[in-house]
A protein has these predicted regions:
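Alpha-helical transmembrane segments of multi-pass inner-membrane proteins
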Residues: 1-8, 15-214, 273-310, 317-319, ...
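Hydrophobic alpha-helical transmembrane segments in integral membrane proteins
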Residues: 69-70, 211-225, 453-482
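Flexible interhelical linker loops that connect adjacent transmembrane helices
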Residues: 433-445
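C-terminal luminal/periplasmic domains and tails of membrane-associated envelope-modifying transferases
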Residues: 475-668
């Protein structure tokens, strides 16, 4: 975690992502150590409550996914089709451009992303929930058949959402986890055999990625091929930054330079936990790899653990149907209530940030989903307390599929999922860690792990203060623009000011401010420049000083931010000014506009040598200046970069743009 802290001092992007990684891995170690340090009965009860909370939290997520697929997605597509030109223009994407085609392709796919934002990451959670809830339903089926039915229903819905999302990796991981769970429950293998099988499954995923890279384009499959590209680039990044890596948020920019020549994608993650950790933290990332591997192995070990003892007089075969010996114990009577209250409170608190945007019907459904999640939490706790082979195999299979999918997807990289995923894996591992009577080190380790969590907590509190101040500025910048959106939806009257004025106000708030690293993040600066480009595209401008101010702000952004997103957005400002200049705009010279465009494009290609748009801009500027040799050279680079995207045809240039580049390349 040392590299995370070091990189965090340099950039808030490294800080907020890295702190979540640190918290997730530190909490995993603390959970396992603390559960091992507890007396057996208390540890068992605590595990049950933790599992109940972690799994039941999936219910509101699954509910949201169902709404997205069958209600929100059709409405979103209809809205896009009705306002397609305006939406594309607001993003600066010409009709038929690679960006527009890629955006439309993703928009038309019905996906249950819930609050994760990524369908493949959400599919990891749904798949794990499907398998774990199925094991819990089997464990509870004879004691509480009604509760078992509800658990089975949630398992079925979760599995259906995985199918709807169409995530091949999640489906294969779910299949592997199910096979492993069924085999463990049916054959009752030894613990060593379970660990070997689980390890083999995870290693096979890594081997599949490497073999797919070796096969190359001789096979039409693309998903694993792209994963092999990510791993190849990650290896190059580790070689160049072996000690402390490039930081939790540094992979994206590094990938632009290190990616293979035929890789058409620009990604922020290696889509493999081990590669992400090594690229982000260098050799220090091996500590997390070892910890994660140990947790997965322990969870597999737990699949072979002896089932919980049944009630007196109940045979071992019926253990899943029996009530624990202390049916009136605190764990059995109070554990479900504790888990239900925690889940209910968390689900209701999660509504607060969205409260103002929810109508009455949606709000009622959110509350009902929270109540249903609370009931699922209580049922899950009782299933875990009953235990048995089915439950032990189910949770071990869920951990295995998470570990497998984490080697080909961003499940263990994405901040919204890493904490939940690692916590479930840690609790699954804790089932295989009974405490011996002479164990004196577990309490010490638990205390040390808990104290270590104070480091990310302290840094997080300090960073949250500046983040809160930056959030207030962003909210002020967005407020005038939101008024126009509400007016378009006929929810509020149209504002008295113009849209261009609102965009300029937002740009000034985001680009001119006192020192705050959270407002100087590339994503915020890029958005500010995009709003600036839209504001100055209006002729005549509302303020004669706007064009000159736009040149100044764009150049300042290029001075302080060496990121492709910022360079591309600065180029949009120059192009907007150039188009406005043709229509008679006054205030800046053509030479100043061309200078900004050339500088932004040069910055763009220096960061991303395969930026088609950057090379095309350089070709256009050189042609306008009468430098045919430079124009031809840049056009040839643009055409070569465009050819390298053959694996993703939608990213290739439209025919008319490519024809223009070919003309420029031939003019020497």
């Amino acid at each position: 975690a040392i590299p995370v802290v070091l990189h965090g001092f340099n950039s808030p992007d490294h800080l907020w992502r890295g702190l979540q990684w640190m918290s997730a891995m530190g909490s995993a170690a603390a959970l396992v150590a603390a559960l091992r340090a507890m007396p057996p009965e208390r540890s068992r009860a605590t595990r049950a409550v933790l599992v109940g909370v972690l799994l039941a939290a999936l219910v509101p997520i699954a509910w949201h996914g169902v709404l997205q697929v069958w209600q929100q997605h059709p409405a979103m597509v209809e809205e896009f089709l009705q306002h397609r030109p305006e939406i594309l223009a607001a993003r600066g994407w010409p009709e038929g451009s690679p960006q527009a085609l890629t955006y439309e392709r993703r928009l038309m796919q019905p996906e249950a992303t819930a609050w994760f934002g990524l369908s493949n990451v959400a599919s990891s959670a749904f798949a794990a929930g499907a398998l774990a809830f199925a094991g819990a339903a089997i464990a509870l089926r004879r004691v509480r058949p009604a509760s078992a039915f509800l658990l089975a229903l949630v398992a079925a819905v979760s599995g259906l959402l995985v199918i709807v999302n169409g995530s091949k990796g999640a489906l294969l991981a779910l299949l592997a986890g199910t096979v492993f769970a069924v085999w463990c429950a049916w054959r009752a293998p030894s613990a060593r055999t379970c660990v070997r099988i689980a390890t083999t499954f995870v290693v096979l995923v890594l081997v599949a990625v490497l073999v797919r890279g070796w096969i190359g384009e001789r096979w039409s499959e693309r998903s694993l091929l792209f994963r092999s590209h990510y791993v190849t680039a990650a290896t190059q990044i580790v070689i160049e930054h072996p000690w402390f890596g490039v930081g939790p948020a540094g992979f994206g920019e590094s990938y632009l330079v290190a990616r293979p020549d035929r890789s058409p994608e620009e990604v922020q993650s290696a889509h493999a936990a081990w590669a992400d950790w090594l690229a982000s933290m260098g050799v220090c990332g091996t500590a997390w790899i070892v910890l994660f591997g140990a947790l997965v192995a322990l969870a597999a070990h737990g699949a072979a653990a002896a089932p919980s003892p049944g009630a007196r007089g109940v045979s071992g075969d019926a253990v899943t149907a029996s009530v624990p010996p202390r049916i009136g114990s605190f764990a059995w009577s109070r554990g479900p209530i504790i888990a239900a209250v925690v889940v209910l409170a968390a689900s209701l608190v999660a509504i607060v940030p969205e409260f103002d945007s929810l109508d009455d019907a949606t709000l009622l459904m959110r509350v009902l989903a929270a109540l249903f999640a609370a009931s699922i939490a209580g049922a899950t706790v009782r299933a875990v307390l009953i235990g048995g082979r089915a439950w032990a195999a189910g949770i071990a299979g869920a951990v295995l599929l998470l570990a497998m999918h984490g080697q080909v997807e961003m499940t263990l990289w994405w901040p919204g999922s890493v904490g939940r995923t690692v916590a479930l894996i840690a609790v699954g591992a804790a089932f295989a860690m009974p405490r011996s009577t002479c164990d004196r080190w577990s309490p010490v380790m638990a205390t040390f792990a808990a104290c270590a969590l104070l480091v990310p907590a302290t840094i997080g509190v300090i960073g949250a203060q500046r983040a809160h101040a930056a959030e207030a500025v962003v909210a002020r910048a967005a407020q005038p623009l939101a008024a126009f959106g509400l007016a378009r939806l006929h929810i509020a009257p149209a504002p008295n000011t113009s849209l261009a004025s609102a965009r300029m106000q937002a740009a000034l708030l985001l680009l001119e401010h006192s020192t705050n690293p959270w407002l100087d993040r590339p994503a915020v600066v890029a958005v500010g420049l995009q709003q600036l480009a839209s504001a100055v595209s209006v002729v005549p401008p509302e303020d004669a000083n706007w064009p000159a101010k736009a040149i100044e702000l764009a150049n300042h952004a290029l001075d302080t931010h060496h990121y492709e997103s910022v360079a591309a957005s600065a180029a949009l400002v120059a192009e907007a000014l150039d188009a406005a200049n043709v229509r008679g705009m006054k205030g800046v010279t053509k030479a100043a506009i061309d200078s900004l465009l050339q500088r932004a494009a040069q910055c763009q290609v220096s960061i991303n040598p395969r930026s088609v748009r950057g090379w095309a801009r350089l070709a256009n500027v050189a042609e306008a200046q009468g430098d045919s040799a430079a124009s031809s050279s840049a056009a040839l680079r643009a055409l070569a970069a465009d050819d390298s995207f053959a694996l993703d045809p939608l990213r290739k240039l439209p025919a008319f743009e490519r024809a223009n580049l070919q003309r420029q390349a031939s003019d020497k």
